[in-house]
Amino acid sequence: MRSKHLVTLFIITFLSFSTVKVWGKDVFAGFVTKKLKTLLDCNFALYYNFKGNGPDAGSFLDFVDEPEQFYWFVEHFLSVKFRVPKHLKDKNIHNFTPCLNRSWVSEFLKEYEEPFVNPVMKFLDKEQRLFFTYNFGDVEPQGKYTYFPVKEFHKYCILPPLIKTNIKDGESGEFLKYQLNKEEYKVFLSSVGSQMTAIKNLYSTVEDEQRKQLLKVIIENESTNDISVQCPTYNIKLHYTKECANSNNILKCIDEFLRKTCEKKTESKHPSADLCEHLQFLFESLKNPYLDNFKKFMTNSDFTLIKPQSVWNVPIFDIYKPKNYLDSVQNLDTECFKKLNSKNLIFLSFHDDIPNNPYYNVELQEIVKLSTYTYSIFDKLYNFFFVFKKSGAPISPVSVKELSHNITDFSFKEDNSEIQCQNVRKSLDLEVDVETMKGIAAEKLCKIIEKFILTKDDASKPEKSDIHRGFRILCILISTHVEAYNIVRQLLNMESMISLTRYTSLYIHKFFKSVTLLKGNFLYKNNKAIRYSRACSKASLHVPSVLYRRNIYIPETFLSLYLGLSNLVSSNPSSPFFEYAIIEFLVTYYNKGSEKFVLYFISIISVLYINEYYYEQLSCFYPKEFELIKSRMIHPNIVDRILKGIDNLMKSTRYDKMRTMYLDFESSDIFSREKVFTALYNFDSFIKTNEQLKKKNLEEISEIPVQLETSNDGIGYRKQDVLYETDKPQTMDEASYEETVDEDAHHVNEKQHSAHFLDAIAEKDILEEKTKDQDLEIELYKYMGPLKEQSKSTSAASTSDELSGSEGPSTESTSTGNQGEDKTTDNTYKEMEELEEAEGTSNLKKGLEFYKSSLKLDQLDKEKPKKKKSKRKKKRDSSSDRILLEESKTFTSENEL
């Protein structure tokens, strides 16, 4: 017995010692050294030798001061399965055999649940520096740079220009070109007149006979050939995060960098320090007022030099992938990490201030979890479900004894009292067709994503998710709202039967699922926005699961706003067991450790709120319609009792773990009636605003760079330059900016390039809709269950003349079954033209405002309606009436369940 105790004591001591060893100052050293050091060295060797010309010292990545470079290395090397590129297989660089088909991040996360990223950064930085020292000796490592290309000070070249021609050299066959040196450029600048006059003046001063002969050939062929003077590009190189962390504006950051660099008397080692010499030379050649302005710039931080030459677009920067460095056409410097987008031009000027635009604000890499970069679906699921598995033992099914003990009132819920309409705000507009509502719902969600991704406050982000609390609630709530709107219009005979096969939630799912659908607006290639859009895509799928009994083509579920929920949990809202039925349904998903638990819970609560919302709106403001479908909705007082019962159950000891798990991922706003209804009212206001905006064209900022209007052609100093520097009221960039801020500004006649969320589908796509619908049904099988043949054939027959929403952010046109094909086509294109005139593109796309994230449902800004939408009512066709009547006879009504 003593020996067993001694063995136990020895094991505990050994384990404690091992833990101290691993979790010391270098928290990952113990584990990584033993198991992953080899794989890490393989990745470093592959990265530094990627070009195949031996290790490159310019490839060093600063993991600590430039977190974006750390995540880049994780994304492109550590998180993918290790493979040797073809161009390196025959080179004896490193022994890669032990590392093949292994992912460093995947293996690392299997040992560490979800470590803090900062210690990982520091550890990998230390390992990289050891690798760098081993290969390059005493060379000082420098992290990669962010490039800011600049060519001109107004229209003066910063560097000596290049004279390009289309005159062919008789010997080489290449076009003649002439690169000016500094002395020649000084003569060029002193010339007065046209560019050819300056070239002729230069010819008279050149002493080198060979260069002089080249200029002579150019001058002699000026009348028959194309001759131009082009400015070379100078790349301002910055360690972006490190040098811009204290500045809230990209352009001001570059200004501050130039001040610090140029005011140093000794020669700076920074690669962009020579820009000061180029500017000093240029300003001395041009003389006043430029030289005086440069001195003011050096001493006064309010004096700015770097200005935008074009209205900036997203993405702000082009970040390169490893394969881009192998492209001989791009010819990238190894030390270049990212470069200012080619559409986002900058130039130098002492005139005016930097325009007020959020795109000029500094973008810094946020700290994200390593699990974001896991390679395979298996890795992602492993890390996600691991969180759920730690929640404890599963909840056992409720017993009859417990039910009889906890339920004191076994009577059925009944309430026929009238609604107090003085406390109800009118919000619902029944005249908007469902097809329009679908597109507007997607657009509203895009605007919500804008607000969330632009927030700088991470306080509302749950610890175990990258999505802000409340976002999934808004996504599901809006989907449920418009889904129920479809049912209400069906019951009131205001909508075409064909809309039953085009559910809003599925439209939203398809809209946000594919990132390629979002090209042309702010969401495309925005990592944060992509995460939110995919989360909304997944969440919206659970709405039809609750509203339509998980099988989306069962006609009986369209007969009320709660029948699908009743069938889902096998109980009726009036039953005293209804709350327990909902909780027990959710317990099954909680015990599985499934994300579906959270999404089903939000969807079920949303459906209950939606019943209350439509009951109040129809009862108070649409009394005739209300009498027709009164029995198809749950009375608000009953809804309140159900919601209160669910909330109390979730707070009980038995189900408290479920509530805790939910709050780890989502907001408690779902339990607040006031906040939920505020979100619904805000969406209704947005619908009215959007309908009004659809009637006019909104001017869109062109992506074409703005050309500066100045009489200065880059030749010499003249009086007009002084006027340009001192008297010009505003730059073209500011003029464009102010014009876009004024929403009532006059419209321009040129073709606009607005990126609409409601784009019409091309005619060629119409023929493919049937196939796409079938593909979608197969894809959604695991969520919705099998399809009924009768309803499937009905929906297939009724969709032959309809525009589908299966691809892209489009709205669908509906046409009655008794219209001819020509008339249907005319109506289709008429609606397409109306949609093309719609406004409502993202304000972030225009770069006019800086949105703060709305972290709670009641904090979302309300959209102000501007005009009333013209009333239009669609009648259901007679054939659809017969179909619905026949199908309704084959199913029991909701009152019999």
Swiss-Prot record:
Residues 820-832, 877-889 have a biased composition (Basic and acidic residues). InterPro entries: RhopH3_C. Proteolytically cleaved near C-terminus. Disruption phenotype: Knockouts are not viable, suggesting an essential role in asexual blood stages. Conditional knockdown results in co-depletion of CLAG3.2 in schizonts. Mislocalization of RhopH2 in schizonts. Decreased number of ring-infected cells due to the defects in merozoite invasion capacity. No significant effects on merozoite numbers, maturation and egress. Co-depletion of CLAG3.2 and RhopH2 in trophozoites. Resistance of infected erythrocytes to sorbitol lysis, indicating defects in the formation of new permeability pathways. No significant effects on the activities of parasitophorous vacuole. The modification Phosphoserine is found at residue 804. It is a single-pass membrane protein; Peripheral membrane protein. Residues 1-24 form the signal peptide. Keywords: Cytoplasmic vesicle, Disulfide bond, Host cell membrane, Host membrane, Membrane, Phosphoprotein, Signal, Transmembrane, Transmembrane helix, Transport. The chain crosses the membrane at residues 597-615. Residues 792-801 have a biased composition (Polar residues). Residues 788-845, 859-897 are annotated as: Disordered. Residues 865-876 have a biased composition (Basic residues). Its main location: host cell. One of its GO terms (cellular component) is membrane. Residues 802-817 have a biased composition (Low complexity). It is found in: Host cell membrane; Parasitophorous vacuole membrane; Cytoplasmic vesicle, Secretory vesicle, Rhoptry. Disulfide bonds join 157-231, 244-253, 262-276, 421-620, 475-536. Component of the RhopH complex, composed of CLAG3.1/CLAG3.2, RhopH2 and RhopH3 with a 1:1:1 subunit stoichiometry. Interacts with CLAG3.1/CLAG3.2. Interacts with CDPK1; the interaction promotes RhopH3 phosphorylation in merozoites. Participates in the formation of new permeability pathways in Plasmodium-infected erythrocytes enabling the uptake of nutrients from the blood plasma. Required for maintaining invasion capacity of merozoites. Required for the trophozoite to schizont developmental transition of the intracellular parasite. This is High molecular weight rhoptry protein 3. It comes from Plasmodium falciparum.
